[in-house]
């Protein structure tokens, strides 16, 4: 059986990778290995001497080979040299390691502290010359790569090595997805039982007041969040909003704005959104608009919110004309998807979240579909009273992680939905129409499930996919208890709403469809008869 590192630590020179890595290994009672030390042992000389005699390209080749071997044959904590992740072959090796469940930790230290440590004692060939200037230049080159390569991001500013090690252990023991991109302030989605315990760490020391926005049904979880916040020294304003879509209105938002004003909330204070997707949508909208933007953290408590609304930076409210027509793109400081909260969900609320999970499998990650197939009966029979600590909890955590990764991939390069991100709307053109015509009595995940069947039927009629893939949509979704048909409205009403869809261009319809599993395309202005015939087929 292949032995793989429990965690791989990367970061800039002076970030404390070796010191923190040794502390992590000590706390977990695991062996520790430093790539630079292993290289010196292998080549029989110090790295500065090797650089001088053979040059950097030769060193990087030796380094890449050693790292590839260690990733396959070392069961402990493994720290890499600062430049190691810049080598393409090492990037591929780390990606493969992550695919097999590995954790690559980007140790992100305060630049001033890291530069000071890196300059101690010399012996760093990459810092020859003006050391601080070289460090800053290397940081500018390497930081984006580190963020891309790692799947765990740990900020260590102000922490002792022991404190940083504890933070690494906490993050590694949970699943985490790092969301970043050109237009995004990077943040982490932490997934696992107890993830909410990171709330104070994510908020940081700056806010004095926290607006805790939540719905009444999640009172048990809001009590826990409030206790954590007060233990952290924050002044907490408890704001209860109507449950589900009725809470996403301008009236509710205005009431919160008035309260924030009356209670003296400033730009340095923060918002925590806790609950289902509607609650996190509204909380994000309030955070984005109060004083042109304050820090906020999402604590989703439903499966749907964990895989959809809480991640990606979309915030918004509904209007009489449609869902989410008023809003903004505004990224959270972090998302804490605590699977402990799922244990309080009724079966039907849990199952609707599987609609968005399946969508991510269809558009990008087929492994999601395989997991859903293998565990469809267990997922359909979900019982919160037996969920925690069960094998199903691990399955669900993996599904959440994979689904969030799909969303992060699309969001990272297209925050404002001008291209790639639109592919996340697979099934949503019809789904949103169903929600509107049903006055939001149909839950979002259920509407999206029917919307995906509609999109599959349309793609088949146009000639993009075969009948087998349409049938697969129906069978997989039905096996989990999701609906695959709808008879609640006329085609004319549906068509009018689809023309109002955000993807529409002028008076032309635009759909997201598959041409194969894992690959989506835009379908612009399809034949009217195909649009109507696909609708007839979901009525059966």
UniProtKB/Swiss-Prot annotation:
Its EC number is 2.7.1.71, 4.2.3.4. Its cofactor is NAD(+); a divalent metal cation. Keywords: Amino-acid biosynthesis, Aromatic amino acid biosynthesis, ATP-binding, Cytoplasm, Kinase, Lyase, Multifunctional enzyme, NAD, Nucleotide-binding, Transferase. SUPFAM superfamilies: Dehydroquinate synthase-like, P-loop containing nucleoside triphosphate hydrolases. One of its GO terms (cellular component) is cytoplasm. Pathway: Metabolic intermediate biosynthesis; chorismate biosynthesis; chorismate from D-erythrose 4-phosphate and phosphoenolpyruvate: step 2/7; Metabolic intermediate biosynthesis; chorismate biosynthesis; chorismate from D-erythrose 4-phosphate and phosphoenolpyruvate: step 5/7. It catalyses: 7-phospho-2-dehydro-3-deoxy-D-arabino-heptonate = 3-dehydroquinate + phosphate; shikimate + ATP = 3-phosphoshikimate + ADP + H(+). Residues 167-540 are annotated as: 3-dehydroquinate synthase. Residues 1-166 are annotated as: Shikimate kinase. It is found in: Cytoplasm. GO terms for biological process: amino acid biosynthetic process; aromatic amino acid family biosynthetic process; chorismate biosynthetic process. Pfam families: DHQ_synthase, DHQS_C, SKI. One of its GO terms (molecular function) is 3-dehydroquinate synthase activity. ATP binds at residues 11-18. In the N-terminal section; belongs to the shikimate kinase family. In the C-terminal section; belongs to the sugar phosphate cyclases superfamily. Dehydroquinate synthase family. NCBIfam families: aroB, PRK14021.1. Monomer. This is Bifunctional shikimate kinase/3-dehydroquinate synthase.
């Amino acid at each position: 059986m292949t032995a793989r590192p429990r965690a791989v630590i990367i970061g800039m020179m002076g970030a404390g990778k070796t010191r923190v890595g040794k502390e992590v290994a000590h706390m977990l009672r695991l062996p520790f290995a430093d790539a630079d030390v292993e290289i010196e042992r292998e080549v029989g000389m110090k790295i500065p001497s090797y650089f001088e005699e053979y040059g950097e390209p030769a060193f990087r080749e030796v380094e890449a080979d050693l790292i590839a071997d260690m990733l396959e044959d070392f069961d402990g904590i493994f720290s890499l040299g600062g430049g190691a992740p810049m080598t393409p072959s090492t990037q591929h090796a780390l990606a493969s390691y992550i695919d097999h469940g590995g954790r690559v930790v980007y140790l992100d230290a305060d630049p001033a502290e890291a530069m000071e440590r890196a300059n101690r004692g010399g012996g760093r060939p990459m810092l020859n010359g003006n050391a601080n200037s070289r460090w800053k230049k290397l940081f500018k080159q390497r930081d984006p790569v580190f963020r891309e390569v790692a799947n765990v991001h740990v900020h260590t500013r102000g922490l002792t090595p022991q404190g940083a090690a504890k933070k690494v252990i906490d993050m590694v023991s949970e699943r985490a997805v790092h969301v970043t991109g050109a237009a995004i302030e990077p943040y982490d989605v932490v997934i696992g039982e107890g993830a909410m315990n990171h709330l104070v760490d994510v908020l940081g020391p700056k806010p004095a007041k926290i607006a805790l926005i939540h719905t009444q049904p999640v009172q048990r979880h809001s009590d826990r969040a409030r206790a954590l916040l007060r233990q952290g020294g924050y002044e907490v304003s408890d704001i209860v909003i109507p449950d589900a879509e009725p809470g996403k209105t301008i009236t509710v938002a205005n009431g919160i704005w008035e309260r924030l004003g009356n209670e003296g909330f400033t730009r340095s204070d923060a918002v925590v959104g806790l609950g289902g997707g509607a609650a996190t949508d509204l909380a994000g909208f309030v955070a984005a608009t109060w004083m042109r933007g304050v820090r906020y953290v999402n604590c989703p408590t439903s499966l749907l919110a964990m895989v959809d609304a809480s991640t990606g930076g979309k915030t918004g409210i509904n209007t009489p004309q449609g869902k989410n027509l008023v809003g903004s793109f505004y990224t959270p400081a972090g998302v804490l998807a605590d699977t402990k909260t799922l244990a309080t969900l009724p079966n039907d609320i849990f199952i609707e979240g599987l609609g968005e999970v399946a969508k991510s499998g269809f558009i990008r990650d087929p492994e999601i579909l395989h997991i859903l197939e293998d565990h469809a009966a267990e997922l359909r029979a979900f019982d919160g009273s037996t969920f925690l600590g069960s094998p199903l909890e691990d399955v669900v955590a993996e599904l959440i992680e994979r689904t969030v990764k799909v969303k992060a991939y699309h969001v990272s390069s297209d925050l404002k939905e001008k291209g790639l991100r639109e592919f996340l709307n697979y099934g949503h053109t019809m789904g949103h129409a169903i929600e509107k015509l049903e006055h939001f009595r149909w839950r979002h995940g259920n509407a999206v499930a029917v919307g995906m069947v509609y999109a599959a039927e349309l793609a088949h009629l146009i000639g993009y996919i075969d009948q087998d893939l349409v049938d697969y949509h129906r069978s997989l979704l039905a096996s989990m208890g999701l609906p695959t048909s709808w008879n609640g409205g006329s085609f004319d009403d549906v068509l009018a709403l689809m023309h109002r869809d955000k993807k529409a261009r002028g008076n032309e319809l635009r759909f997201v469809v598959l041409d194969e599993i894992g690959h989506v395309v835009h379908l612009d202005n399809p034949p009217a008869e195909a649009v109507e015939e696909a609708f007839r087929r979901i009525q059966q």
